[in-house]
Amino acid sequence: MKNILFVTPTTTFDNGAEISIFYLMKYLVSQGYNVFSVCQEIPEPQQDEHRKHYDEVGINAIYLPAAKWWWEDAPGGQPGSKAHRVESYRRNIKEIGGVIEEYSIDLVISNTVNVFQGAVAAKVAGVPHYWLIHEFPEKEFAYYLDK
């Protein structure tokens, strides 16, 4: 295994999940792995800063436009229509599948329970997938109590 793709929950360094995964990716690069990360596309000044940090340590960042990066029930609102979000999810799964194929990805790792696109794309491509879940069952999943 040489090529690993991470699905990153946000295109920031604002939270523990993003910070910890950055250091894991950096470590894997130092061990000779080819590391790729798909993130949600954001406005240029912030995205350029994000890319700079990734470039400095050899992480290949791929930014994808998305109506909503986290799954439908996750926090963050529901921008646009449901049809628009569903189409965006489908497009992102297809794009991630394209990354898996183009770079001969051996393993896909989703870095939060809130991003599902990598799991679906990996399954379709027949590539192993791991989920690094940082959330706790209590409080952080309160939005599921009504379901």
Predicted feature residues:
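Histidine-anchored nucleotide/phosphate-binding helix
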Residues: 21-27
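A short, histidine- and acid-enriched strand-loop-helix "catalytic/donor-clamping" loop
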Residues: 69-71, 116, 127-146
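An aromatic- and histidine-rich active-site surface loop
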Residues: 107-125
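Nucleotide-activated donor-dependent transferases that construct or modify glycoconjugates
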Residues: 1-20
